[in-house]
Amino acid sequence: NTFKRVDWVCQTAGEIENKIRALNPKYGAFTYLGEERIKLFSASAKKNNSSVEPGLIVINKEGSLEVGCKDSGLLEIETLQMPGKRIISSKEFVRGYKSTLSKNLKFS
């Protein structure tokens, strides 16, 4: 199970993107938001020099989630799944969980 878990501190955005693609759809890579296990089904690495701390969640100007990674890069989350829910876009997640998304919220 540990090979399916995303390690934001030790993996680059490109490595995490490849892991998510490789494990989709049968297994799904995952991360934690607090106590909740979140499955990640699609994402894309962004090639910018970000000052975003690994694991830190930010909302981009399009309203999608981006997460800081090891290489000072960002990974844009495209689709994800909360426990017991259907797969949704990160934009839907942002709209539905806006109250949960506070400053300095991190995936672990």
Q: Could you say what each language-model-derived stretch is?
A:
Residues 1-6:
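Flexible, acidic loop-helix segments that line cofactor/substrate-binding pockets
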Residues 7-108:
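An anion-binding loop in the catalytic cleft
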